[in-house]
Swiss-Prot record:
Protein name: D-alanine--D-alanine ligase B
Predominant place of localization: cytoplasm
Cysteine-cysteine disulfides: none
Cofactors: Mg(2+); Mn(2+)
GO molecular function: ATP binding; D-alanine-D-alanine ligase activity; metal ion binding
UniProt source species: Mesorhizobium japonicum (strain LMG 29417 / CECT 9101 / MAFF 303099)
EC number: 6.3.2.4
Length: 308
């Protein structure tokens, strides 16, 4: 029996609550199987006082979205002096802001797509760049609010400026990159491997592709040339280190090989709180690298810390 008491933080109150509940349950169950004493904490506004009373040895952060992966919960854990998994305050905040993260990784030679930040109301009547392009909320995950504007589309999508839009007023407009969706997991200072995501019946890796059964297929390891495979691993590790991530992260890429095998590789974003069910991408990539789900989570618990 392992002696550590682990508080698994799950749920929360962001739009990604259902995803977090799924990740948190899987992690809590697996950690119990590994011999840890586990308490499941469905996070509310009183989480600070709950954790202060609970006094766990480690907090396993299974939250997703604002509050859970933007540096907020990380700051609370730092204040309480509770070691926690995944990235720290600054790296979490930077990674959650897609535009700022892109600026940082670009300085270390990671290729990114042309983009600009705009107010959503300012792009209602005129294209902010020549289509095709993608509109993304600056601070959301799980592909919430992502809109693809196709080549030849005469007007910007009206939903972005409407009352239906629930993802903040600031959006990132990014050049659309044709090609295959690839992702690479990083564990500590090692890139674990590259997986291809093949959406089923979807134009890109949206919410349903990620979380609805049969929404996508995963090709692990990705069937690309050894040079491209190594390049993506190198870029993912560079992004992880440049943003200041710790523990586990996952970088997403587009790979356009329509005209040559070497093609164009473009980094899209780094996820500091990737999905953590046994069938999620990071555990799947880790399994191909020889790490079981339980072993991966145990490593994360032992890697947990404050102030780094």
């Amino acid at each position: 029996m392992k002696s550590k008491h682990v508080a698994v933080l799950l749920g929360g109150f962001s739009s990604e609550r259902p995803v977090s509940l799924s990740s948190g349950k899987a992690c809590a169950d697996a950690l119990e199987n590994e011999g840890y004493q586990v308490t499941r904490v469905d996070v509310g506004r009183d989480v600070g006082s709950v954790l202060a009373e609970l006094k766990p040895d480690v907090a396993f952060n299974a939250l997703h979205g604002p509050f859970g992966e933007d540096g907020t919960i990380q700051g609370i854990l730092e204040y309480l002096g509770i070691p926690y998994t995944h990235s720290g305050v600054l790296a979490s905040a930077l990674a959650m802001n897609k535009e700022q993260a892109k600026k940082i990784v670009k300085t270390v030679g990671v290729p990114v797509a042309e983009s600009k930040v705009a107010n959503r109301f300012a792009i209602q009547n005129k294209h902010p760049m020549k289509p095709p392009y993608v509109i993304k909320p600056v601070n959301e995950g799980s592909s919430f609010g992502v809109v693809i504007v196709s080549e030849g589309q005469s007007h910007p999508p009206q939903v972005v400026g409407s009352s239906e839009w629930k993802y903040g007023d600031t959006v990132m407009v990014e050049r659309y990159i044709h090609g295959r969706e690839l992702t690479c997991a990083v564990m500590g200072d090692v890139a674990l491997g590259v997986c291809e995501i093949i959406p089923t019946g979807h134009s890109f890796y949206d919410y349903d592709s990620k979380y609805v059964a049969g929404g996508s297929k995963h090709e692990c390891p990705a069937k690309v040339s050894p040079n491209i495979y190594q390049k993506i691993q190198t870029l993912a590790l560079k992004a992880h280190q440049a943003v200041g991530c710790r523990g586990v992260s996952r970088s997403d890429f587009r790979y356009d090989d329509r005209h040559s095998e070497n093609g164009e590789v473009v980094w899209l974003e780094v996820n500091t709180q990737p999905g953590m069910t046994p069938t999620s991408l990071v555990p799947e990539i880790a399994a191909h690298a020889g790490h079981s789900f339980g072993e991966l989570l145990s490593w994360m618990v032992e890697d947990a810390s404050c102030l780094r």
